[in-house]
Structures are given as structure tokens and as C-alpha cells.
Amino acid sequence: MKLERVIISGGGTGGHIFPAIAIADEIKRRFPTCHILFVGAEGKMEMERVPRAGYKIKALPIQGFQRKLTLSNLKLPFKIIYSLLKARKIIKNFKPQLVIGVGGYASGPTLKMANLLGVPTLIQEQNSYPGKTNKLLASKAKAICTAYPNMERFFPKDLIHYTGNPVRAEMVDIIGKREKAIEHFKLDADKPTILVIGGSLGAKTLNKAIKHGMEKLHEANVQVLWQCGRLYHSDMAISVDRRNLSSIHLHQFIDKMDLAYACADVVISRAGAISVSELSLVGKPTILVPSPNVAEDHQTKNAMTLVNESAAILVEDQSARSKLVNEALQLLENVSLKQELGKNILTFGKKQAAEQIVDVCISIAKKKWK
């Protein structure tokens, strides 16, 4: 079946937005004339990132529940009702063959209204432990595409398609790029490289741990390619400059992630869904430090899925300052463990995730509106 009109809803974080855009790109690759409309949440990241990727987006006034008693919480029931009504209007006006939910605040009202209007829905779950919205909406979905195996304990078995997370292809294309990467980042080809990545904003714990262990890393004749994030760059830059450590290569943000992965001997990362999916495709020995500041503690669950299969090492957030650098240096020296981790993490990689998800979309899409 030809896809002509599709709504994709959700967002809030890059972990929701980037897979959504990857799915949209694959739909457009196969069906260039398909009209795709995104539905996001007011004031969230998707309202900026989606138009930048070339797609139209409409906003719902939806928000999450705050743990503290606030005026915002008192307004929440009214915002939910208004978001449901607005989502209904958007769907009736756009007349999609299919609504895809990727998680995040906006996906709840949009998928709920699509189900009530008889529009097929597909849920794309990025994590090994689903969010509450996806679990609530799963029974009414026509299909659920998961990033991890063994998700039957959360979703109806007959609806599950184990596709993996769609990632940007250029991010994981690393073969034959090590020499180019060394030149690009001005690294020493004779030194082992530790890549540290904590997201575009940065990860406070990772930054503190690397800052604490900079001298030890330098003395060990190891170089560090370090993405510290926008929020921490000025403070970390002062620390690096003050110590005059030539082996510490600090970046606010790395936009050439293919080159960063290509030159890395060991990777230190948070355990967000998309980071884990990218790491599973590049096959680098990895130390994961899950963020404790996420819903359902899903980063720890993502990490443990790999750790239980000897595909990654876990360092807990509260232990990172004292343990992380030592763990990384020990891993660099352990050739057999590096090989084992690199080999095992590849078994979680799904190169054709976007293509498989679009195949499922085609199989469940509505032929036409009456």
C-alpha cells in the first residue's frame, strides 16, 4: 500500500525525536509525495528540531505532572482535555492513514484520539522498559515496534515487532574512517583514545568524573575525546586549560559522531535509548553510566539488558567519580575483554530498523477515509 498521509506524534527529548525523524525520512524516501505531519508539545524540543528537519509540526498544550504541588499541576486536567480536543481536530482535518507514537507528552492525546476515530496506530518504544503512556495505549495499537527483545511482559505478544531503534545512518558509518578521524580531531595516532559522550547538554556526573581523573588519564598516556555539553563547557575548558593537558580534547558538542566512534578504543556514555542503539551498531567496548534522573529509571534497565549479555560494563552514577576512570583504564589494557564486549554489543544492533518500521506501517495503514 502507498503511504500518502501520516501523523507522527511525541517528543520531549532527542531519544523520542531522532527516531521519529528517521522514520519520517524513510517514509519520504519510499513515498516522496507522502504528506507527514508531526504533533508535539508546546515549548518542547520537537517544536524546533522537527521544522529544522524539514517537516511541519502542530503543538498540543500538554505537559507532564510535576512532583511538587504547583499551579501548573492544577491546570493539568484542563490541558489534557484541551489537548485531546485539539488532537481530535488535527486528525479529522489531516485525515491520516496511520498515526505513529514515539513516546513523550504529545503522543498520549494523539494516539488516544486516533484510536477513537478508527485510525490505525503504531507505537515505537525506544527503551527496554516502556513509559507509562505507551503501556496504557498498547492494547489499542495495531502494532508495537520495540528496540529490545523479550518485551512480551509489557505488550501483547501478537502486536510486537522487534525492529530496533532507527538511528541516523551517517552516525554509525565508521568503517575505514580512523585515519580521517585522527586528523579531524587532531589526535595522536599512537595513543589509545577514550570517547566520552553525555548528550548535547552534557552529563554532570561524567564531566565531574573525567575532570577528577584528568591527570591520571594524561599520565597513563591516554587521550580523551570529550563531549562535555553546552551547560558545562566553560567550566570544563577552564579546568583543562589550567592543567595544560594536551591529551584532553574537550568539545562542547561533536557533530561528526561517525569520526568520533571511528577513532575510539573505549566509549564512556550515558545509557539513553539512542546512544545505546548507536553503540550497538558501531561495536565499540563500552562503559555505561545510566542517568538516575529519568522516568522509570529506564537508562539502568537499558544498560542492564546489555550488561547481562556481557555486551557492556556498568558503572553506577553515584560511583562514577571514584571508579569510572580506573574502570576505563583497566578496560583499555584488557584486550580479550574489549574484544568480547565489542563482539557482544553488535548482537543488539539493528541496521534496518527504519526500513522495518515502515514495512509495518504499510501493513497496518488505513486505505482511505470515508
Q: Model-found features: residue ranges?
A:
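Conserved nucleotide-sugar phosphate-binding/catalytic loop shared by glycosyltransferases and other
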Residues: L3-G11, R30-K79, L84, Y232, ...
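C-terminal alpha-helical cap of glycosyltransferases
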Residues: K350-K370
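Active-site-proximal region of nucleotide-activated glycan assembly enzymes
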Residues: K56, N115-R178, L187
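A short, well-ordered alpha-helix in the C-terminal region of glycosyltransferases
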Residues: L337-K351
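Acidic donor-binding loop of glycosyltransferase active sites
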Residues: P96-L98, A262-S277, K284-P285
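Structural loop-to-beta junction motif characteristic of Rossmann-like glycosyltransferase folds
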Residues: Y55, V119-P120, D265-V266, G283-S291, ...
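Donor-nucleotide binding loops and adjacent catalytic segments primarily
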Residues: K44-M45, R49, A53, G176-E183, ...
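An aromatic- and histidine-rich active-site surface loop
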Residues: K44-E48, L98-L117
